[in-house]
């Protein structure tokens, strides 16, 4: 895969599946695909995207600034504050040393990625802020390599936390994870599906899950809710049934 393709993949790995992720993917493919775009407008879109966390906004915003450093008229607080606000004084010092001594000598994406892998996330965040504030001191490949290494660490932490919740020893947590998964699936299919029958089905599923939450569901029944919803979606006429069966 190309340098930009790798970057898109790592950035998308940070976000949860859903309609917002599909919209973000379309934007990233446009920005990294070589099409001309206005940097300020792109940054405003990222800043106002509600489905993204502050860290995600900062990383995605920094990545497109690395694409067009000459068009960057001013530094954005929604990028600098999350990057500089994490960690201790010691980790920030490590990040500064990493940026000033090691990354300045790097010349390739993979070299920067391998060096960054050996550092903790808070140090990498501060290192990226230094790169963002001094774009002319580093090549685009080095900046994106450092960013992708951090994305891999962040995605790993997020997926471990999600798996931990899904395997929780508390039945109520597992049940709610199933319900959240079912609601997200219904909302996504409602937004992406074509035809009134698809949208009606998705709305009914959301309504039924809401009723179950209001009335309460037994531990045993609650755990099967998401599976039942998935089965209904698979059996319905929702356009590309092959994709539905593959991902649901």
Curated annotation (Swiss-Prot):
InterPro entries reported in the protein's UniProt record: Flu_matrix_M1 (IPR036039), Flu_matrix_M1_C (IPR013188), Flu_matrix_M1_N (IPR001561), Flu_matrix_M1_N_sub1 (IPR015423), Flu_matrix_M1_N_sub2 (IPR015799), INFV_M1 (IPR037533)
Origin superkingdom: Viruses
Pfam families membership: Flu_M1 (PF00598), Flu_M1_C (PF08289)
Region (Membrane-binding): 1-164
SMART domains: Flu_M1_C (SM00759)
MF-aspect GO terms: RNA binding; structural constituent of virion
UniProt topology in membrane: Peripheral membrane protein
GO biological process: viral budding from plasma membrane
SUPFAM superfamilies, sorted: Influenza virus matrix protein M1 (SSF48145)
Keyword terms: Host nucleus, Membrane, RNA-binding, Viral matrix protein, Virion
Ranges where the record places region RNP-binding: 165-248
Function: Plays critical roles in virus replication, from virus entry and uncoating to assembly and budding of the virus particle. M1 binding to ribonucleocapsids (RNPs) in nucleus seems to inhibit viral transcription. Interaction of viral NEP with M1-RNP is thought to promote nuclear export of the complex, which is targeted to the virion assembly site at the apical plasma membrane in polarized epithelial cells. Interactions with NA and HA may bring M1, a non-raft-associated protein, into lipid rafts. Forms a continuous shell on the inner side of the lipid bilayer in virion, where it binds the RNP. Determines the virion's shape: spherical or filamentous. Clinical isolates of influenza are characterized by the presence of significant proportion of filamentous virions, whereas after multiple passage on eggs or cell culture, virions have only spherical morphology. Filamentous virions are thought to be important to infect neighboring cells, and spherical virions more suited to spread through aerosol between hosts organisms.
Family per similarity comment: Belongs to the influenza viruses Matrix protein M1 family.
Name of protein: Matrix protein 1
Organism per entry: Influenza B virus (strain B/Ann Arbor/1/1966 [cold-adapted])
Classification of source organism: Viruses, Riboviria, Orthornavirae, Negarnaviricota, Polyploviricotina
């Amino acid at each position: 895969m190309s340098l930009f393709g790798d970057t898109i993949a790592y950035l998308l790995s940070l976000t949860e599946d859903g309609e917002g992720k599909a919209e973000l993917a379309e934007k990233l493919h446009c920005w990294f695909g070589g099409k001309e775009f206005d940097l300020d407008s792109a940054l405003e879109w990222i800043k106002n995207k509600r489905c993204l966390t502050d860290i995600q906004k900062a990383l995605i915003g920094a990545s497109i600034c690395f694409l067009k450093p000459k068009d960057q008229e001013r530094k954005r607080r929604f990028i600098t504050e999350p990057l500089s606000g994490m960690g201790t004084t010691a980790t920030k010092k490590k990040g500064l040393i990493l940026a000033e001594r090691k990354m300045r000598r790097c010349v390739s994406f993979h070299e920067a990625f391998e060096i960054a892998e050996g550092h903790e996330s808070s140090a990498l965040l501060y290192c990226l802020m230094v790169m963002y504030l001094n774009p002319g001191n580093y090549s685009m490949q080095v900046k994106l390599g450092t960013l992708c290494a951090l994305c891999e660490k962040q995605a790993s932490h997020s997926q471990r936390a999600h798996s931990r919740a899904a395997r929780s020893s508390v039945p109520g947590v597992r049940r709610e994870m199933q319900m959240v998964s079912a609601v997200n699936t219904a909302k996504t299919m409602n937004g992406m599906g074509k035809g009134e029958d698809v949208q009606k089905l998705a709305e009914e599923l959301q309504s039924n899950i809401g009723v179950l939450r209001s009335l309460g569901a037994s531990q045993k029944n609650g755990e099967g809710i998401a599976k039942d919803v998935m089965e209904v979606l698979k059996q319905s006429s929702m356009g590309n049934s092959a994709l539905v069966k593959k991902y649901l």
